[in-house]
Design a protein with these regions (language model features):
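Acetyl-CoA-dependent GNAT
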Residues: 1-51, 56-57, 69-71, 75, ...
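Active-site acidic-Proline motif in GNAT/NAT acetyltransferases
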Residues: 56-58, 62, 90-91
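C-terminal "cap" of GNAT-fold acetyltransferases
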Residues: 82-102, 106-126
């Protein structure tokens, strides 16, 4: 889904003043990341999109994914976003459980994801 091009262009859409890219460091090692970017072409006004929530295997099970997701949602509030959207897949069970705990709810697709088993979620901020 364009990951290599996105990586080469960092910070890209995740840059300030409308986006954020967070890295979690543990003893100087990058343990995880999460990003937020504006999404102006969705049917939701003043929305942002959470992307690239990832925790390296050695650092999983310590709540780091939750901390990153919560920090991105807090950043969305600071940036004045009304809601945060995301997409995830069937096999990302731990992530889907986390999103549900954070208040995300399933919504109709806000863009075309060619991967089977895609789910589209939204949480209201504020």
């Amino acid at each position: 889904q364009g990951f290599e091009a996105e990586l080469a262009a960092l910070p890209g859409d995740y840059g300030e003043p409308r986006g954020v890219l967070l890295l979690a460091l543990v003893d100087g090692d990058v343990a995880g990341c999460c990003a937020l970017r504006p999404i102006d072409d969705a049917d939701y006004s003043n929305a942002a999109e959470m992307k690239r929530l990832y925790v390296r295997k050695a650092f999983r099970g310590f709540g780091l994914g939750r901390q990153l997701a919560e920090a991105v949602l807090e950043a969305g509030l600071r940036l004045g976003c009304a809601s945060v959207l995301l997409d995830t897949l069937d096999d990302m069970e731990a992530a889907r459980a986390l999103y549900e705990e954070l208040g995300f709810q399933e919504i109709p697709p806000y863009y075309h994801n060619p991967l089977p088993g895609a789910h589209y979620l939204k949480v209201e901020l504020g």
